[in-house]
Amino acid sequence: MTMTDIALVVLIALALAYAIYDEFIMDKLKGKTRLLVPLKRMNRLDTLIFIGLVGILIYQNVMSNGAIITTYLLISLAFMACYLAYIRRPKLLFKSTGFFYANIFIPYSRIKNMNLSEDGILVIDLEKRRLLIQVTQLDDLEKIYKFMIDNQ
């Protein structure tokens, strides 16, 4: 195995670990999920460019009679990128003591202010940071509001 193959295996393993954490583990952390809200997908064009570049690498590897394992690893990397960007749904998980946003748990005590922008983006101000949450359906903003009021 070359250094390139090792790097590809590490990248694929990290992407797979992230996908497993996001899909199965995060739901079970920090207690029962009280509300799950699907979010808008972001960076689709970036992933399409990345998959195109990986496709160029696959073509280059096949045309130069490169190692077959490298080709399979590049194909696997392209499939993982496709899954993470187009199949997996980003979500906002509300728990009893906080919520998961971008796979990071944020306790409710860190929230300093909440606002709703004109274009339907929920803005949550934390101590040092501002979260911009874009939901897929505007009705979900009402669910979030009701959940936050009921649990304060």
From Swiss-Prot:
Database matches in Pfam families: DUF986
GO cellular component terms given for this protein: plasma membrane
Topology relative to the membrane: Multi-pass membrane protein
HAMAP family hit by this protein: UPF0266
Bilayer-spanning residue ranges: 6-26, 45-65, 67-87
Top-level lineage group: Bacteria
Keywords recorded for this protein, A-Z: Cell inner membrane, Cell membrane, Membrane, Transmembrane, Transmembrane helix
Protein name as annotated: UPF0266 membrane protein ECA2388
The species this protein was found in: Pectobacterium atrosepticum (strain SCRI 1043 / ATCC BAA-672) (Erwinia carotovora subsp. atroseptica)
Membership in a protein family: Belongs to the UPF0266 family.
